[in-house]
Amino acid sequence: MSVSTNLKGLAELGLKPSEVFHNLSYEEIYQHELNNKEGVTSDNGTMMVDTGIFTGRSPKDKYFVDEPSSQNNIWWGPVNTKVSEAIFNELYAEVTKFLDNKKLYVFDGHAGTNDDTRISLRVVTERAWQHHFCTNMFLRPTKEELAKLDPEFTIINASGYKNPKYKEHGLNSEVFVIFHLAKKICIIGGTEYGGEMKKGIFSVMNYYLPLKNVLTMHCSANVGKDGDSALFFGLSGTGKTTLSTDPNRKLIGDDEHGWDDNGIFNIEGGCYAKTINLDPKTEPEIYAAIRRDALLENVVYDATTKKVDYSSAAKTENTRVSYPIFHIDNIQPGSKAGHPNTVIFLTYDAYGVLPAVSKLSIEQAMYHFLSGYTAKVAGTERGVKEPQATFSACFGQAFMTLHPTYYAKLLGEKMKKHQVNAYLINTGLVGGKYGVGKRMNLPATRQIINEILNGNIEKSEFEKHPVFQVSFPKSVNGVDAHILNPRNAWENKEDYDKTAADLAKQFVENYKKYLTGSKEFDYSQYGPIA
């Protein structure tokens, strides 16, 4: 449905479109995508799009305007780079000029399912599939809400505009994602990747909410039949979406949550799942969610049958699907729950030295939250691929707008107050490092999580790891005991000891950044021994 180009607020943004399409229905979006030749439908009717050169976020192209209202709060550094007001103004003028007389799609909605702390938002895009992405991922307003919705924060996405003066501006590339927190505006140029809008709003929520004493978290969440909720923290690819989507528990959300005085709540209205090697046997709920109204990104498909090949990474390893949360059958109404009983940190340990599951004290949980360890396998296709440790504070450093200790303090206070249990789960390798070790079996990890959530794991006898200082169970119902003690799973015990010591050193080295000045966050004694 086309609406007047005078849609409230557009002129104030400096936008002069030829046509405006506002909060389209899924059927309308589908027709626009086809008419604009933006995508192809798969054999089961799911829209498939290609996001162009960028198949992932561009973290080095993310900036915040250095302005008085926010400059003393922002965690400046490699994650949040300063840009001047003058450069923002210049690029803002270029972006609005670029969108002049174009057909625009406008999504108005919300972020945050808690009425007290949600923000109303507007996303302006030039492509129908980006409008589709927003409709899937943000909270869709009712007709009544839409009629009176006054956006507090706006994203203007001119993905087709590239900044030709980036060198003169001292920026990283012709791509930019710039936030002006005083004006409550974000402008995007040069990248079509949908995740920039999703994580852009998350970065904004990570600024405003903690300042109101509400913890924002890069985690998934679900709730059991008795109202017992659990949080799953982890970096991309560690299993947040997969492990929180559980047929026996209701899904609250798969990636972004808040925790306030009433409990936990989802920030989003949809899920954004990785689809590489998606298997209907091990991930039936996600597989079933991929249907009409879902949106597949950068997948490879058969040109004739349009059947998707989920095993192919020909375009990217980061193949994705976004879908509205109601595509999952077993969801928590309202996407919120009471205070969590359990916090689980997920790590993909490519060194294969961490236990399959470890119980953490609150102090150990603080250490591991600030460390945010996972490991990825770097390198080219030729030659040896060695694991590379990645330390991403709060298991989501790229989206943290305030200093990591700000979130850690809130997490520690809430965990103590509500007596929350914490566990560290290795979804990575067992029996050796990359090249030798095998990926932790998904059914085994699910069984470990079931035993944590039903409380049975507490009955186990625990052993303290001599290097990592965490406690791991000697047995877990339904799980092969040899994977529980990581050293036992290695053929060469000396190799294990050396690899564990190497990783411990990296933990210690990384944590030094929290040891300067105040000792408030010195949890180093609860971390690995190097």
From Swiss-Prot:
Q: Which cofactor does it need?
A: Mn(2+)
Q: Where in the cell is it found?
A: Cytoplasm
Per the annotation, how and in what number is the cofactor bound?
A: Binds 1 Mn(2+) ion per subunit.
**What terms describe the molecular function in GO for this protein?**
ATP binding; metal ion binding; phosphoenolpyruvate carboxykinase (ATP) activity
One Pfam assignment: PEPCK_ATP
* GO biological process, alphabetically ordered: gluconeogenesis
Task: Name the residues that bind ATP.
Answer: 199, 218, 234-242, 283, 320, 445
Top-level taxonomic group:
Bacteria
Enumerate the PROSITE patterns for this protein: PEPCK_ATP (PS00532)
Q: Any idea which positions bind Mn(2+)?
A: 199, 218, 255
Per its record, the protein catalyses: oxaloacetate + ATP = phosphoenolpyruvate + ADP + CO2
Q: Which UniProt keywords apply?
A: ATP-binding, Cytoplasm, Decarboxylase, Gluconeogenesis, Lyase, Manganese, Metal-binding, Nucleotide-binding
Give the record's pathway.
Carbohydrate biosynthesis; gluconeogenesis
This enzyme's EC code(s): 4.1.1.49
Q: Which InterPro entries match?
A: PEP_carboxykinase_ATP, PEP_carboxykinase_C, PEP_carboxykinase_N, PEPCK_ATP_CS
One Gene Ontology CC term in the entry: cytosol
Q: Which residues bind substrate?
A: 57, 193, 199, 320
Function, please? Involved in the gluconeogenesis. Catalyzes the conversion of oxaloacetate (OAA) to phosphoenolpyruvate (PEP) through direct phosphoryl transfer between the nucleoside triphosphate and OAA.
Query: Which family does the record claim for this protein?
Result: Belongs to the phosphoenolpyruvate carboxykinase (ATP) family.
Q: What is this protein called?
A: Phosphoenolpyruvate carboxykinase (ATP)
Gene label: pckA
